[in-house]
């Protein structure tokens, strides 16, 4: 398993697309669930409601990486009520793989030991 120092030295050589941190409440668990989204509308709200009902946030931190959603489905206060701990906004070119590279680099920099990815 990589230590944070090892991760930092490896990350220096990665080409990570630019992103902004819209919401970050800190790491609570050793694992996280990463959800890449773009204009998911009610679908992401329904999925987050189901995850909240199942208390997924009791076992892993939920981090959403947004590829420039314009449908208003990712209000920060609503996400916080559904136990989302992080919202990243990809600001450079690229599609899904760029979103995932942003999120994985962020998760490793935060010291997560396990990452689960689900489709938004």
Task: State what each model feature region is.
Residues 74-110:
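Conserved donor nucleotide-binding strand/loop of the catalytic core
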Residues 29-32, 52-63, 85-86:
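Short loop->beta transition adjacent to catalytic acidic/histidine clusters or analogous donor-positioning motifs
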Residues 66-75:
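A conserved acidic beta->alpha catalytic loop
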Residues 1-50:
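N-proximal low-complexity "stem/linker" segments adjacent to membrane-targeting elements
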Residues 112-120:
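Short beta-strand-to-loop acidic/aromatic patch adjacent to the donor-nucleotide binding site
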Residues 67-68, 91-93, 120:
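Short, ordered loop/turn segments at secondary-structure junctions
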Residues 35-37, 66, 118:
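Short beta-strand/turn micro-motifs composed of small residues
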